[in-house]
Design a protein with these regions (language model features):
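All-alpha prenyltransferase/terpene-synthase fold signal
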Residues: 1-356
Length: 356
């Protein structure tokens, strides 16, 4: 899937887009101003991440300046062109501001996640917590969330309520993940045994909720009916789930030269992904379970990956991803067909096509 870059006009930062060039051309031809919207988002992100305190400004812009696909603002823009409403009634400024809100929250979670996971790098640079300490990384994430909340208040009570609920879901998903982690936890933490149900609970909160909100914002701010808003939100939820499923599959099945990711990275970090959980569900006392219970050195991880590649669990995970993509695309049926629906359909299908 080719990824064009935006035109760096008006001082905006060129970045890769998560849509093919031909789809982008159709969107622009039909007046769905993806480039203009994302240019506005980029400019307003810099404004909202600004602080009069020089050091706060430096840290808050650290990951922002490192780039990113702005996937969530893109979804806000596309979902904003779904409802059956006159083209000139689509609120450019409101959609751009909503894109800023979801991207600020996403950036904030990256600062926090890197502390939780003790990640060494993010977007090709040293993680903020290693460069400046855990405390400063956490506070910077909080600062960006505060800026997102401030902007949401300018768009109204509904927008503020939705992002507040989303933040709660993000936290619930992260807490559930910690409870189910394979690391040693204090006795005061109630441990949750790994299961597919627990995994889905984590992903729905930690990953899918903000993507769902991005699509909900777009349809809501463009005057969509209750039916349209909920359909857009469900589309976003399913897409968020599907992309996580495909990431899990790629961790096992991908060619490292193509994906840039060493197979079994999640396994080595103690993360039980969908294919792993399906395999353990089928054979809880088998060879894979024994490997996972041992010290996960490079040899054991390689052996586990080899077992998974030959296991029906991988095909089952692929089927789950495909079913979830189809569920997302089905939600688009309530909207009139156009460039936005076709783009969102292609985007959802990419969760499957990237698997090869």
């Amino acid at each position: 899937m080719s990824e064009p870059t935006t035109n760096a006009r008006d001082g905006s930062v060129a970045m890769p887009l998560a849509i093919p060039a031909d789809v982008l051309a159709e969107l622009e031809a039909e007046g769905v101003g993806v480039l203009a919207t994302l240019d506005a988002v980029e400019e307003r992100l810099l404004e909202r991440a600004h602080s009069s305190h020089a050091f706060t400004r430096e840290v808050s812009r650290y990951l922002l300046d490192a780039g990113g696909k702005r996937f969530r603002p893109l979804l806000v823009c596309l979902a904003g062109h779904l409802p059956q409403a006159p083209r000139d009634s689509v609120p450019f400024d409101a959609l751009a501001d909503a894109g800023v809100i979801v991207e600020l929250v996403h950036l904030a979670t990256l600062y926090h996640d890197d502390v939780i996971d003790d990640a060494p790098a993010r977007r090709g640079i040293t993680s903020a917590h290693l460069r400046w300490t855990n405390t400063l990384a956490i506070l910077t994430g909080d600062f960006l969330m505060a800026r997102a909340s401030e902007l949401s208040a300018e768009l109204g009570v509904d927008v503020t309520r939705i992002i507040s609920q989303t933040l709660a879901r993000l936290c619930e998903g992260q807490i559930a993940e910690v409870q189910g982690s394979q690391t040693l936890l204090p006795q005061a933490v109630p441990v949750i045994e790994p299961s597919v149900a627990h995994y889905l609970d984590v992903v729905s909160g930690k990953t899918a909720s903000l993507i769902e909100t991005s699509c909900r914002y777009g349809a809501l701010l463009s005057g969509g009916t209750a039916t349209e808003v909920e359909a857009a939100a469900r589309y976003g939820f399913h897409v968020g789930m599907a992309f996580q499923f495909s990431d899990d599959i790629l961790d096992i099945a991908s060619d490292p030269q193509e994906s840039g990711k060493i197979p079994g990275t999640d396994l080595k970090e103690g993360v039980l992904t969908l294919p792993v959980l399906y395999a353990l569900e089928d054979d809880p006392d088998g060879e894979l379970a024994a490997l996972l219970a041992s010290s996960l050195d490079d040899d054991n991880v390689a052996q586990a990956v080899s077992l998974l590649r030959g296991h029906t669990a991988l095909d089952r995970a692929r089927a789950t991803a495909e079913q979830t993509v189809n569920a997302a695309i089905d939600e688009l049926a309530v909207f009139p067909e156009g460039a936005a629906t076709r783009a969102l359909s292609r985007l959802a299908r990419y969760a499957i096509t990237r698997l090869g």
